[in-house]
Amino acid sequence: MLQKYYVATPVGGHATLGPRRIAKQLGLIAALLILINIVAGVAHVLGGNRYYDLARMFILDGENNIPTFFSSLLLLAAGLVLASIAAIKTQEADRYAPHWRALSIIFVILAFDEMVSLHEMFNHPIRQLLGVDGVLFFGFVVLAIPLVMILAIIYARFLIHLPSHIRRIFVLAAVLYLGGQIGVEMLSGVYFESNGSTTVAYLLITTVEESLEFSGIILFIYGLLSYAARNLREIRLSFEEAG
């Protein structure tokens, strides 16, 4: 049973990192980025272009910046853990191995999308094609909502077979992540359409949105590691000093 995760130390021993500690460390990084985002965003709104570079580097709603990189790493980490679970489930001939594998692919795609903002490319074409605005101002949600519903149907039995505490974690993680990625995004579209993005109110809306996404991904990673710790055979990674 996988109970702890081992990493090398300079003295040749090992340090242990459990799911809770990993999630806590990731949460602290996320909280720091959220705080810096608020400071940088308010400085930009009140101080104008003098603080543009600061805001561009740390604003949560920005692109190709530090928070985006961190979010991409979280999604990629989830994808890699899912891939590891899928590999073991495949060896065990588990009936749900394809579900784990598909999830790993989905999260790697999400990580790539987060880094290059691929979904943003759909906003204007969909808005023009369907003539939507308001809560659908960010047009990609028109595609996201039915895709999420289809995945929910496909993964219903998969969720039911999971241990109850893991199922609760996964469901809550999905609610948090999708609540930010789709729910609050729709509300921000209404505000953005009328008021633009350079306001404290919009900063707060997008901060809530991205905070929910951070929380959902980190909780999901915690759930994945907890599942591995309780349900999979032991995996130990050892690193030997070179030379």
Which residues make up each language-model segment?
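Short, Lys/Arg-rich, polar N-terminal cytosolic tail immediately upstream
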Residues: M1-G18
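Hydrophobic cores of alpha-helical transmembrane segments in multi-pass inner/ER membrane proteins
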Residues: Q3-K4, P67-S84, V142-I153, S211-Y227
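Alpha-helical transmembrane segments of multi-pass integral membrane proteins
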Residues: I29, H99-F107, S164-G189
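Alpha-helical transmembrane segments of multi-pass membrane proteins
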Residues: A30-Y51
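Interfacial helix-loop-helix junctions of multi-pass membrane proteins
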Residues: L46-N49, H119-L129, L187-E209
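Short aromatic-rich membrane-water interface segments that cap or initiate transmembrane helices
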Residues: R56-F70, Q128-V142, T199-F214
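Membrane-interface helix-boundary motifs at transmembrane edges
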Residues: A87-P98, R157-I169
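Membrane-proximal helix-loop-helix units in multi-pass membrane proteins
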Residues: A111-I153
